[in-house]
Amino acid sequence: MKLKTLQLENYRNYEEVTLECHPDVNILIGENAQGKTNLLESIYTLALAKSHRTSNDKELIRFNSEYAKIEGVLNYRHGTMPLTMFITKKGKQVKVNHLEQSRLTQYVGHLNVVLFAPEDLNIVKGSPQIRRRFIDMELGQISAVYLNDLAQYQRILKQKNNYLKQLQLGQKQDTTMLEVLNQQFAQYALNVTLRREHFIKELESLAKPIHAGITNERETLSLTYLPSIKLSDMSKGEQTLWDEVITLLNDNIKREMDRGVCLFGPHRDDLGFNVNDMDAQTYGSQGQQRTTALSIKLAEIELMNIEVGEYPILLLDDVLSELDDSRQTHLLSTIQHKVQTFVTTTSVDGIDHEIMNNAKLYRINQGEIIK
């Protein structure tokens, strides 16, 4: 899939702008705080109906404006598709082919993106929350079922935590409601856990050879899914696994009541990275951690192509300067002529000349595009 045009109205520091996109590489160059990252963010937001930089949609609306609008025309294997996102201070509206989508789960997945920003280098050494968000953002784009299960899980988790807090404070005495919530919680927790486990296995199978290529076969990468709910054997039947989950929850009702919070579930999952059988988070060098992060991002691109039948759009936010020549070369070999890419940078110095030869350059200055 390729983004043909991108139009912004009152988005961040852009009053009104139209970008005619190059099918291969689009380089956005400018000083800091001019709007380069805002442009990339708008593409990400158009894809996932949420920003990766803020959870408050109001921040996306230009100062002193009533609304923000993002519109993109997508070229894909079946033809052309317009996508629209309209944001007001009361909420947001999304459209596919000019038809409003009542649920975000119906919208997400039409435009697939992979974002690689400097903070993504923290996927290895950062907090478990960063890794859970990474799983959710990528898996959610290729599986509407996962997105729905996750939304239902988060809804019930919130209800359960509220009820546990009331029990802890003595505002409630009856645990019957908690047992009912656990029944629903167990099903969605199991669904999310199984889909995450399958996703990590697929991602690992693609990341391993990529990582080996970058390191000239000197290093071996492995991924380990670390679920909060530890099941004896995930290949068992769903009913058997559900029984295990509900038993765990029921056995720990008193602990959770004492703590006033849910102690088990996918909201406490983590993902481990091992390089040559050593924990990359604890023992990996900065170079090893960056190679691991790049391998994961390149594997994402391939996995989306396998699952969706088309390559996603790649967003590189000021990250090329963080990669040495070898890593840039492997990045180039993955994206060349098949993945539409948007790159932000303050200077073209250090960008591979092959990337430059196949690119369209846009200069960004105070929310305006100077071609």
UniProtKB/Swiss-Prot annotation:
CDD domains, A to Z: ABC_RecF (cd03242)
Gene Ontology MF, one: single-stranded DNA binding
Pfam name, any one: SMC_N
GO process annotations (BP): DNA replication; DNA synthesis involved in DNA repair; double-strand break repair; SOS response
Tree of life domain: Bacteria
Main subcellular location: cytoplasm
Keywords annotated in UniProt: ATP-binding, Cytoplasm, DNA damage, DNA repair, DNA replication, DNA-binding, Nucleotide-binding, SOS response
GO cellular component assignments: cytoplasm
Sequence positions that bind ATP: 30-37
Alphabetized InterPro entries for the sequence: DNA-binding_RecF, DNA-binding_RecF_CS, P-loop_NTPase, RecF/RecN/SMC_N, RecF_2
SUPFAM superfamilies reported for this sequence: P-loop containing nucleoside triphosphate hydrolases
Subcellular location: Cytoplasm
Function: The RecF protein is involved in DNA metabolism; it is required for DNA replication and normal SOS inducibility. RecF binds preferentially to single-stranded, linear DNA. It also seems to bind ATP.
Matches recorded under NCBIfam families: recf
HAMAP family: RecF
Family: Belongs to the RecF family.
Protein's UniProt name: DNA replication and repair protein RecF
Highest classification ranks of the organism: Bacteria, Bacillati, Bacillota, Bacilli, Bacillales
Gene: recF
